[in-house]
Amino acid sequence: MDEHDIFKLITAGVRFTKKSKKEPSSKQQLQPLPEVSKHEEPVKSEESDKDDEDITEFRLLDGDSSNQPKRKKPKKEKTLSPKELEIQKAAEEANETRKQYGIRVLGKNVPPPVDSFGTLTRDFKMLPRLQQNLLSRNFDHPTPIQMQALPVLLQRRALMACAPTGSGKTLAFLTPIINGLRAHKTTGLRALVLAPTRELAQQIYRECAELTRETGLRTHFISKVSEAKQKHGAECKQRYDILVSTPNRVRFLLQQEPPLLDLSHVEWFVLDEADRLMEEGQNNFKEQLDDIYAACSNPTKCVAFFSATYTVPVAKWALRHLKNLVRITIGVQNSATETVQQELLFVGSEGGKLVAIRDLVRQGLQPPVLVFVQSKERAKQLFEELLYDGINVDVIHAERSQHQRDNCVKAFREGSIWVLICTELMGRGIDFKGVNLVINYDFPPTTISYIHRIGRTGRAGRPGRAITFFTQEDTSNLRGIALIIKNSGGTVPEYMLQMKKVRKSEAKMRAKKPLDREDISTKIRPETKGDEKHKSTKLKKVERTEKILKNRKGYEKDLNSKQKKLGNIKTELKPAGKRKGNVEKKTKNKNNQT
């Protein structure tokens, strides 16, 4: 059998087509036989040769059959029914609307956003009286958060919403509550709205009272716990439909024997500023919220969380407790509003802050102005300094009585106070109309705190301005806030963006325990024992660095550059008495020489 016979045998029944461009598989390729030496040439019978040829012929033919081109059957285009075409068109329109207004949603079967309050009347049978109340408050067109949150809550879906400050979140949860409750019932509380501060809860209550006019619904705000027994006790015949309060007061009433509140009929459970209520650390509301949520035993209740920032504790709690959850985000998550002009101002030291704020006053401030500090002690100190400068200023903090705080907020709203100094107490949700400037006198401990602070200005589309002072000690937290300013359309120096990122553990520590800052004062105060201790510890550190430098190679070169600095620091840190003694010795030596 020669080469031609072998080729014919191999190619028997094979058809070569131009269409098939596939390379032959490893099984179909002819593999060279292993070389056999003449001395070890195997002896085979003719029968075995024929059997092998038949086997190879079968294998090749079998493999070649798979190499033939398979014609794919053309897919039949699915014809959509008129209903399916309408659904597809509606979904495309909803996505276009979301893209236009920067709305992002997560969840199954999320309803499309609404473009007007009239759509709610048509699709969800909104109360005519409620729509009239909205128009009387000049709410003629829904904001992006309202466009998406209203249809979700009107379907009684669990919701976690994040939208910038001043975007209309309060109206987004009050409207579905009022429309869902419809009219007054004597069963008791059917809606519970919780806020982290009394001022914010009072603001929500005022808004709710305006929207429930002539609807028959009764809204209540717990101003004093002592009066709650008369209004919520078993002897009281008056029943409220909506309760707005802080977690502390609600939990206190639940812990009384017997409990003064019955939350078993609650149909709506809403948390405003949920990230503050759920945050970890000192003065948190987690335990209180767990007790209150357990008391709301109605299995059909609708739960909604609203905030300007997303945090991990809120997301964990929502995923653990809520079913069929919808998540809505407006714009960039955890970002500031674009209507606020943001500035970072380096002031050098704590003393430079007073100089900077007085320069701003000299240039001409446009009231009203909010000034944020990190503690109530510093708020008092700054108040005294600015009061002596003749500025129309007031201060609000936790040590002031509730009556004083209410009067202070009222005066600031009316415009009789131009500058209001406050702590983090006023950084959440409070809506002051027309605040032109926010000054972060003390650098915010976290980026979330910064977003909420500057959110007191530039609300409802109005322009605003925010100035943040920072010293050398604040540079470690500078990068995060610089990124927020850049993401919201502002300009920051490039070196701020290239700074080292802070570790999570360090960021948590600084959030829990802010920096220990110098007192706000222009007075020259005498040195105290605490100052002497501080100086002695600093002196020890300087001496320790000198020892380390001496042990290094090339110490002389290094010391020449640093010796002057270390010497100046040591002379400043040494007690005044020792310095005087040294000066007297030097003068005596000079006199003796003369």
UniProtKB/Swiss-Prot annotation:
It is found in: Nucleus, Nucleolus. GO terms for molecular function: ATP binding; ATP hydrolysis activity; RNA helicase activity; rRNA binding. Its main location: nucleus. GO terms for biological process: maturation of SSU-rRNA; ribosome biogenesis; rRNA processing. InterPro entries: DDX52/Rok1_DEADc, DEAD/DEAH_box_helicase_dom, DEAD_box_RNA_helicase, Helicase_ATP-bd, Helicase_C-like, P-loop_NTPase, RNA-helicase_DEAD-box_CS. Pfam families: DEAD, Helicase_C. ATP binds at residues 163-170. GO terms for cellular component: cytosol; nucleolus. Disruption phenotype: Lethal in 2nd instar larval stage. Enlarged nucleoli in larval salivary gland cells. Reduced levels of mitosis in larval brains. Conditional RNAi-mediated knock-down in germline cells results in hypotrophy of the nucleolus. Residues 150-328 form the Helicase ATP-binding domain. SMART domains: DEXDc, HELICc. Residues 339-503 form the Helicase C-terminal domain. The keyword Nucleus applies. It is an enzyme of class 3 (hydrolase). Residues 36-47, 77-86, 505-561, 571-586 have a biased composition (Basic and acidic residues). This is Probable ATP-dependent RNA helicase DDX52. A motif (DEAD box) lies at residues 272-275.
